[in-house]
Amino acid sequence: MPKLDSKKEKYLKQIVENFIKTGESIGSLNLKQSYGIKKSPSYLRAIMNQLEKEGFLEKSHSSSGRIPTLQGFQYYAEFLSFDENENLANKLKDLFARRRINIENTISEAVKLISESVGTTLIATTNNENERLMSINLTQISQNEGIIVVVSSSGNVENKKITFSEQIPRQDVKIAIRLFQERLINTPLLEISSKLAILKQELEKQIKHSDELLHHFMEKIFNFQVQNKSNIYNKNSLILDKEISRAKLVDLLYIIEKKSIWEMLEDRTTKDDDTLKISIKSPEVSFISKKFEKFLPIKEISMVGAAKKINYSAARTGIKLLEDFLSNKSKIRKG
């Protein structure tokens, strides 16, 4: 896509933002009046003619004004949508300042705010790579059975039944649980199996059937695997949008529920950020996808909506503030 000079960028930005706000075309006189531009309408008309010839604007069928083309929206989204959206920024900063809210609830509320402000359906993908063991306890429920309660740093609670036997006696399980409480708390869930091998010698000093017990814990209790989870917010934004055909809607609902939008967009990274992809290929749909650093709890955020209705500056504002918040939280935890 050719890079425009600063003069053309200024007026294209105003025309696109006016259309996002009003949904209407704009002529040179209205552009001058709306933005207090000191140039004459004829000067602005000449600039708009140039932008039309270059494929960034087109004439509206219902008036003499012009509206952005898909290329105009793509250019705006990639190069001109960096102004902070003050309304969303203030809401997010207020949310992030509430120390009483746990991190998971904060993230959930933040992405809801972003989705509503941008005017899109938003998909937030997380996984358990960074989850840690926060507690492990045994509750006996009968003479021969117990429940091992495992709590992770995300607040996830798993209840796993254990049957006591000659090879796995109740007293040995209690000893093992006590050792795990001393040595495994705050260990990443996906590293627990490897740490159990280190604890084997310590267990052998205290219990008779350490091999059988360790094998049971590795197979039945600490059998954690990488799991991706996608939460969808503001789905009605897609479902109720009259500009999206029913056939396209079916395709989009399948995509947001079954696929990684980041991977689907292939090489659509923006010039300024190789972790951000923006794709505007039809009036019906625009995709925005952000890949987060591995150590952060969110792996990917993607937004889907009608190309000409999305508030692109709000999208950038929300993504940046959320990324900054999560990065700061991660540094505090590591420190």
From Swiss-Prot:
Belongs to the HrcA family. GO terms for biological process: negative regulation of DNA-templated transcription. PANTHER family: HEAT-INDUCIBLE TRANSCRIPTION REPRESSOR HRCA. Keywords: Repressor, Stress response, Transcription, Transcription regulation. It comes from Mesomycoplasma hyopneumoniae (strain 7448). Negative regulator of class I heat shock genes (grpE-dnaK-dnaJ and groELS operons). Prevents heat-shock induction of these operons. The lineage of its organism: Bacteria, Bacillati, Mycoplasmatota, Mycoplasmoidales, Metamycoplasmataceae. GO terms for molecular function: DNA binding. It holds the Pfam family HrcA. InterPro entries: HrcA, HrcA_C, WH-like_DNA-bd_sf, WH_DNA-bd_sf. The keyword Methyltransferase does not apply. This is Heat-inducible transcription repressor HrcA.
